[in-house]
Curated annotation (Swiss-Prot):
The active site is at 123, 141. Its EC number is 3.4.23.36. It is an enzyme of class 3 (hydrolase). Residues 173-182 have a biased composition (Polar residues). Belongs to the peptidase A8 family. The keyword Transmembrane helix applies. PROSITE patterns: SPASE_II. It is a multi-pass membrane protein. This is Lipoprotein signal peptidase.
Amino acid sequence: MLKLFRETGLRFLWISALAFILDQWSKYTVIDTMSLYQSIQVLPFFNFTYVHNYGAAFSFLENAGGWQRWFFTAIAVVVSVVILWWLKQSPRSQKMLPVAFAFILGGALGNVYDRLVHGYVIDFLDFYVNNYHWPAFNIADSAIFIGAALLIIDMFKNGDKKSEENGAESKAGSANSSETIK
């Protein structure tokens, strides 16, 4: 069992656990110290603003009648199971992708927990410029964003290597087939 954790992407589950714990700790701190819709200015462009999000990212489908709670929960659970399976399958040599998926998993589980326990996601990080406010978000959303950014970086970083490898394999295959034809 320990070998499974040492030799696969499961070795990065501590990142998921840390993201989940930080997310829940921050949300409970907000619940205990702020009232709903209260806003506390931290910097000239950043507030803590306690809100409930019944939808998905950017409050998508927030007023859809309640079915979205279970829909987004189901999606997050399925994605989490797929990520766990993928982490188990990933070899020790891979680093960036398992780390990215570990961040996404921790964030997904943080928001799933909110939906199951509260019926909504607790958001409180509020960035703004003048009167334009970016939609409020939380630590779980940040973990998902970090994971997605790492996936994109890996795609550009390792996509070139894979293209080169595929090109080399293709050339080798062409050379072998032309030798066979002669």
